[in-house]
Amino acid sequence: MSSARNVEGFFVDIHAPASDNIDELRRIADANGVATGFWDWYGNWVGVSASTLLKVLGALGLPLDESSTVGDVREALRLTEEREWRRTLPPTIVARQGGGYMFPVHVPDGSWVNVQWVLEDGRKGSCDQVDRYVAPRMIDGELVGRATFDVPHWLPLGWHRLVATVEGGHVESATLIIVPNTLSLPLLESSRRVWGVNAQLYSTRSASSWGIGDATDLADLAAVCADKGADFLLINPVHASQPVSPLENSPYLPVSRRWLNPIYIRPESIEEYASLPQASREVIEQLRDETRQFATREDLIDRDRSWEAKRKALEVIFAAPRSYHRQSQLDRFIERGGSELSNYALWCALVEREGTIELPEDLARSSAPRVELERLELAERVDFYQWCQWVAAEQLEHAQHVAREVGMEIGIMADLAVGVHGYGSEKWSRPELFASGMSVGAPPDVYSQQGQNWSQPPWSPRSLAESGYLPLRDMVRAALANAGAVRIDHILGMFRLWWIPDGCAATEGTYVYYDHEAMMGVILLEAQRAGAVVIGEDLGVVEPWVRDYLRDRGVLGTSVVWFEKEGGGWPLRPEHYRDRALAAVNIHDLPPTLGYIRGIQTTLRSELGLLTDDIETVRAGDRLELEQMGARLHEYGCIDGAEPSEREIVEGLYRYVAKTPSKLVVASLVDAVGDVRPQNMPGTGADLYPNWCVPLCDSDGEEVAIEDLPTDERLTSLFALLRGSVR
């Protein structure tokens, strides 16, 4: 499509009158929640091309693409404006408890209609019609009228239904979700503050690990942290990964967020292991010993080797007989998982047989022609992968039980990834939920001047509404099933996401807006029912109203000391931090604090060719930031002396965040033991840096095992500091 840029920075079709095209594009984009421009990192307004808009609108289900004319756009706009008039009820209504909610009902003009609410417990009642006149519209040659009804303000929280019965016998139903106005929990309503620990579970190993931290290690780590006074343990996402090599190392690129990664299973902790025949146990012990020996020789975590050994061990245990009680538990788990669990397990079995997650076309989606036949042929492997999910859930549930039993107020804090792999089971099972031909990413900023493409397909806002937001509900329920809190990575994704058309650069995307009121409502409903705290990762450029909105809904934000600035780039004073937040010195995308003090991050970025400025300029900026931070630490009595040691600076930073009013304070385990290597170097792949494969080490590069933590001097000192100052 031939295009030119007009003076407003908006792309227009040069074959049509510019003003007409701008108006039509803006109207249809606005009507579908697609941004026609955005403010960049530098405060400049950037227009979005017509090509991008048309591709994105097409991905949203409209009959548009790059070749569309102004006439096509106008026809699509007509369809958009008539969409809600073509159905009796909206697909989903999300209403805050106590607030009431008015909704439209469309019927043949002049026809009567009755609308009932049906609660999840079966109780029923009628919705009242509101005296509000809206002129009828002609739809496909028929005059359609609109009536307005009201959701009673006193309906209880829950997943309910609306049922409309129209004169003539037509019946239509919709999902009705009554959600909390704000998350109400004792911890949030008290003046008490608590602290906890952030750890990458895969990197935190013990003498009993199979080369990677697991659920049994998690229980032990929680006990260690609780004994030191911590009230929560934040871990990386434990979502499902692919079942064959090469495994994806990033926990933030799972194949499904509904299901768990069986690599975190400890085979010996499965109940049936104890009753295995001696020969079977010897097979498992040999697999374990070989994996441990390899892990002790290598500097990095090898997920492929660990999973290959665990899979073989799990197959031995899976084949063992189970007691009636245990089999009954497994059967109930599979029944609750339903078709979603069955499809996930079948996807695993197919990928295992094909040796790749890029399945052939006749198996490329759950509705593909050969899939049901393969479900029968691969039934035993399907059973195995369903069993793995049961075992993983059981072991993670035990870790949360241990965390609470040893005194943690919150326990395990789960982490929820922003998206999934484009060839993963989540998209394979429900492709209609995702926008075709799109990837999620980020626009250019000061750190990534070409933008970012995360290679994750976005949920379609319309498809989510049509599904009653059940995929979101199930995802949140899964995250909270074995946790007392959830951190939502890039919580702005509940408001808007940067969509990039396939084949385009990350700079050629645009924002697509979601119904944040509905999505946050679903999250809060599930969190309220689970009694769980919700933390939103709201770093970066965020409109102030978004943070205000999250605060009003009872969601805690995230404050990182290096990102909290005031005039002149100076560190924000601790008393000015948000109280409704999790305050941190370090996060997984930053180097360990000791590594930053030593300049390791800048050296690495220079060696990898990632710096856009010369290294001395960057080092000068690092020195200035550390000098300003040091001055603040002195000012607030967080460090003493003119030349504090590296360890004193690290502890001083934690004294600083402990002085904030933030409800939660988190210490990174890497800081507690003096690690220096980054877990993740944003903007790099496995060819440049071993992201998400670095085991927990001390400042000399020696691995620190969980057994070492109770007596680790540096950790004990830092945790005692937090125990005494965060109340």
Show where each model-derived region lies.
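Structured C-terminal cap/extension of enzyme domains
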Residues: 674-727
